[in-house]
Amino acid sequence: MLDPSLLRSSPETVAAGLARRHFTLDVAALNALDQQRKALQIQLEQLRNARNEASRQIGQARRQGLDTGAMQAAAASNGEEIKTLEQSLERTLAEWDTLTIGLPNIPQDSVPDGRDEADNVVLRHWGSPSTFAFPPRDHVELGEALGIIDFAAGARLAGTRFVVLRGAGARLERALTQFMLDLHTTEHGYTEIAPPFLANADSLYGTGQLPKFEEDLFALRDDPYYLIPTAEVPLTNLLRGEIVASLPQRFCAYTPCFRREAGAYGRDTRGMIRQHQFDKVELVQIVRPEDSAQAHETLTAHAEKVLQLLELPYRVTALCAGDLGFSAAKTYDLEVWLPGQNQYREISSCSNFESFQARRLQLRYRAEDGKPQLVHTLNGSGLAVGRTLVALLENHQQADGRIRIPAALRPYLGGMTVIQA
């Protein structure tokens, strides 16, 4: 949520920032509602003052034994007028909320201009795209040949965009999850959390999924819960409504994630790249505002370390203003090389939300002057486990169809060096 005081005092500044996203703010409507609010509040204050004065005069008249009938009638009329104005103010504030709750975050000045992913800026590469002395196969062909990926079973059990991992495939997914959690907790200083996989509407509102993205969520039919689309939701909400005594706070969690992919019809229909259910290790940091820029770089480096230890070539891109997520002020994407697709694909988004989520969450700390101030929140995937499995299969495939296990992962697979049929 954007700062209401900024929206009221400098709507043109907000409009200019949102225009970089190619989002048009209706400044005239915003100003009209604010002027209406001010006028109603002034009228209400005057009427309430008059009511208080009338009450004082009625009390004084009664003590003097005077007739107060006319005065009481006038006070009753005043009360009805106050009630009408209060209802008008309530409607005006609701209209303001409806208009402003759908406003995305303002991009940081360092975010490149652009309309969509074609305008994102590549910042750096790690490693070179894998090359082979044979035609590389994609993870679907590799996994099915090894008997470790079963899309037919996933479709039979649930439907399209589901998969079953078997044997070494299931073990590999478990090993990747454990490897990521151990790295982030023992080397990067995160506290591991085991959260619920269901969330209420308040939690999803706090992180920005509701109300705007409800169509992409799986909702329970008879209970007021949603399946979480990412562990960002429970992790960021852990301290909702609190004044945090100590910063920074770093949380990580493994969870399955559930997404309807309502806007992805026809995209990535082959393989495990886009699933309704997928596993992910999530990183969340809660920091002081002056520390959030550096925290963003640090969090991104933590996600990069996973790829480096797994010997997976990748690149880091800065998302342009038009491609930013709704709540983000700045985002880096990590894109891993997939030989089977002959292209880089996103495997992690690392974002700084500044105070956007914290304002919804009423998540604060005490500044040096003792006054509560909003924190800044950040998160990123560290990593998406299914896409990491895909990248590992494709980048470490051998000519005979076996998969080489990178050294960092072998302790989690009982010393296994290859996966083979």
UniProtKB/Swiss-Prot annotation:
L-serine binds at residues 230-232, 282, 381. CDD domains: SerRS_core. One of its GO terms (biological process) is seryl-tRNA aminoacylation. Its EC number is 6.1.1.11. GO terms for cellular component: cytoplasm. Catalyzes the attachment of serine to tRNA(Ser). Is also able to aminoacylate tRNA(Sec) with serine, to form the misacylated tRNA L-seryl-tRNA(Sec), which will be further converted into selenocysteinyl-tRNA(Sec). Homodimer. The tRNA molecule binds across the dimer. This is Serine--tRNA ligase. It comes from Acidithiobacillus ferrooxidans (strain ATCC 23270 / DSM 14882 / CIP 104768 / NCIMB 8455). The gene is serS.
